[in-house]
Amino acid sequence: MKKEFKIISELIANNTRVLDVGCGDGTLMKYLKDEKNVDTRGLEISKNNVRNCTSKGLSVIEGNAEKDLHQFPNLSFDYVILSQTLQAFYNPEKVIDDLLKVANKAIVTIPNFGHWKVRIHYF
């Protein structure tokens, strides 16, 4: 599991409800479900990732965060996670506003494009 996911999981209390936006293959969701008894849901844009998640028994729907977050009822989750995807949105401010409507707490991570391990690939 990615180090980042371990850090995120430490911020989330046991027995809570979490929406993972851009959940990818569901690795973090599965960990939270198995290790912290978290009720997880996912929103993912990739059909292949949605299929992969559902084959693991995870509750994931296909959707675009910029268009579909408003469909979730206000404060329907304790936490919402947006990991490593904020930079891909056309309107990140709207996405953040929508995240904060869906949950009491938002955990947002972004890539560190200045880190040497990232920059070394440019040379």
Locate the predicted segments by residue.
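Conserved alpha-helix/loop element of class I SAM-dependent methyltransferases that forms part
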Residues: M1-N15
